């Protein structure tokens, strides 16, 4: 599992490597990544650790630059305590391909255990699209403010809620994360606004299917809360508004 401390350390090493590559003119002076999923929650301290790190980039061109940072094996690219940071691109990874990841990388580290990174281009899990609203709501955490080349931004908790809300109903860990987000506090009005936006940029059939997934997952979430003797009026209102507006 990847802890918050490991996340910060690994991205710091990647920024050093990216800065060296930028100084050679191999990549641009700035690359923006959007951290979603469990890595985002771990960095915020909302969960202890995550199995892998999910990142979204804006286009294939940025993916190419990030690929260079992750996989370039040059011995001159030593960072931190004189080490080389090299990831292996996992092309044949059926589970991740099924989810729609464009590229899956793994850093083999016998001392600190593996570090897995899934990189999506614009669209996540063949579902929601990284919109201008999502980018505008994202924040640059203090841990990454001093980076020179990588701009690792955290998408909002509301957008994480939506990303996790439209995954397969069988992903139990997403229900756990949705409970954490609900406990931490999210703005359902922001989510309704983003859903309206997604409805305009995603094809109607696909959008209807995604909203159906979200609706079913929210019903499961409400049932889990009820089994714990809990209730969220805000969640109830969101489910009702979702049903009236989209389902």
Locations of regions flagged by a protein language model:
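Compositionally biased terminal segments of proteins
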Residues: 1-247
